[in-house]
């Protein structure tokens, strides 16, 4: 929906909500009585905001694109109205909005007066991936102007740095397919409760670089490498022989016990600070054996806690 169209609808008190009927209809019949869940979708241009919005829409969220801040507040008021069935609102915001960072702060402050704390989903990707995507689509960057594409991307990254720092969930789409991005968003937003904590345990290979979205990184290259065992080399850390080999090494189980205890403390602290998402990265040389086995084992231990845990093997299959 266009910004102008939404403005017209809110002024008239009706209108269409995408292809699903009018705003007036969307605000009636059988909604939640206790409030509305709000997610602000933002991030770097070309990083996948549109895909994220489509996934949220498929999950049943009411999605609006590039609304002025005051209309976001009005949409929330519709959701708070008695009988409203708008219980989940996702708004896509980008740097084409004038005074973007100030607008985002205003929205947060305004919604706080309604006892609503909006979550911020921030999507990003590496510079080389963004350049490749823009070149493939033959599009110009919204901040490019008379500059080069790389300069436009750099300007946007600098502008959005404060937003990224305060985001609830950061997803780096550099190495994600559309399917993998959809899976990440579905796991984060499908059927969650407000107080739930979502933990992603991600294995990776140092030879391919650090995960940009990791909250904490642990190196398990202190363990012997199954790559040098002929019978284990073709398999991955998901194979029981490789897993048994890795976990059977001196110090492996002690590491898991200690790291699990440390994460319990960290996760409790994040909960107190209102952070609902955490990515724990575990790395080895190639992301095939040790980090995969340790990530699987750690995720199993975390499942015993009151957490939603998923495992992501970023570099599995790259060798």
From Swiss-Prot:
InterPro entries: P-loop_NTPase, RapZ-like, RapZ-like_N, RapZ_C. It holds the Pfam family PapZ_C. Residues 1-26 are annotated as: Disordered. One of its GO terms (molecular function) is ATP binding. GTP binds at residues 94-97. ATP binds at residues 43-50. Residues 1-12 have a biased composition (Basic and acidic residues). Gene3D superfamilies: P-loop containing nucleotide triphosphate hydrolases (3.40.50.300). Belongs to the RapZ-like family. This is Nucleotide-binding protein Mvan_2698. It comes from Mycolicibacterium vanbaalenii (strain DSM 7251 / JCM 13017 / BCRC 16820 / KCTC 9966 / NRRL B-24157 / PYR-1) (Mycobacterium vanbaalenii).
């Amino acid at each position: 929906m266009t910004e102008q169209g939404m403005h017209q609808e809110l002024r008239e008190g009706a209108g269409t909500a995408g292809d699903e009927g009018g705003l007036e209809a969307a605000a009636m019949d059988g909604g939640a009585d206790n409030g509305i869940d709000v997610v602000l979708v933002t991030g770097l241009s070309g990083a996948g905001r549109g895909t994220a919005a489509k996934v949220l829409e498929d999950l049943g969220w009411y999605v609006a694109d590039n609304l002025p801040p005051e209309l976001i507040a009005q949409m929330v008021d519709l959701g708070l109205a008695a009988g409203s069935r708008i219980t989940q609102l996702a708004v896509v915001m980008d740097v084409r909005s004038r005074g973007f960072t100030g607008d985002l702060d205003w929205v947060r402050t305004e919604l706080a007066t309604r006892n609503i704390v909006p979550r911020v989903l921030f999507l990003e990707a590496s510079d080389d991936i963004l350049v490749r995507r823009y070149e493939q689509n033959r599009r110009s960057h919204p901040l490019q102007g008379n500059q080069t594409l790389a300069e436009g991307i750099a300007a946007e990254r600098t502008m959005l740095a404060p937003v990224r720092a305060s985001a609830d969930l950061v997803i780096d789409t550099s190495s994600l397919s559309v399917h993998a991005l959809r899976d990440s968003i579905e796991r984060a937003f499908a059927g969650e409760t407000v107080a739930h904590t979502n933990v992603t345990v991600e294995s990776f290979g140092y030879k391919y670089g650090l995960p940009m979205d990791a909250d904490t990184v642990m190196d398990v290259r202190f363990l012997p490498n199954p790559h040098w065992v002929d019978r284990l080399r073709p398999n991955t850390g998901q194979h029981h022989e490789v897993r048994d080999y890795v976990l059977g090494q001196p110090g492996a189980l002690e590491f898991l016990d200690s790291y699990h205890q440390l994460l319990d403390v960290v996760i409790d602290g994040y909960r107190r600070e209102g952070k609902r998402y955490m990515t724990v990265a575990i790395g080895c040389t190639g992301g095939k054996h040790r980090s995969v086995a340790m990530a699987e084992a750690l995720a199993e231990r975390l499942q015993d806690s009151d957490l939603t845990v998923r495992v992501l093997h970023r570099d599995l299959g790259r060798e």
